[in-house]
Amino acid sequence: MQTFYIIGISDNRNQFLSPEIRNLVSQGKVFSGGKRHHELVHAYLPEDAVWIDITVPLDAVFCRYEEHSEIIVFASGDPLFFGFANTVMRKLPSAKIILFPTFNSLQMLAHRILLPYQEMQTLSLTGRPWDAFDSALIRGDKLIGVLTDREKTPATIAARMLEYGYD
């Protein structure tokens, strides 16, 4: 049985990693995450670490995972909140998954502006179609927290809203 340790991290260059996570990382051999995650954590990895970039198509990534029994994955924020842990559970239902979440970007925003988080309708456009976003607009949701990516940026989202008559 494969074991995945999925560690949620922030975008902060000076990562806070608990002693438990630092110990896990120091003993790890195989690590994975996006290119940005690698940039953020490479200083913590052992010298002989193997890194598997999470890139699309994901089938190639999961083929590489098959070669290893334990993989430490770095993911953004809460790995279950529209995150990579969901993908691992879907693709490898028999895998053992141990999570170390941190705050996600929408939680951080809510905390910064003192907004009760449950009042925000949340959705992800990260590698996803516009459907959930369009539905939220059609429903008239007042507060929409959107996870973005390199293609569906805040500017792209604003342009789409203007195109459909929101100003």
Task: Identify the role of each PLM range.
Residues 1-103, 107-108, 129-130:
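Class I S-adenosyl-L-methionine
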Residues 2-7, 107-167:
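Beta-strand/loop-alpha-helix module characteristic of Rossmann-like adenine-cofactor folds
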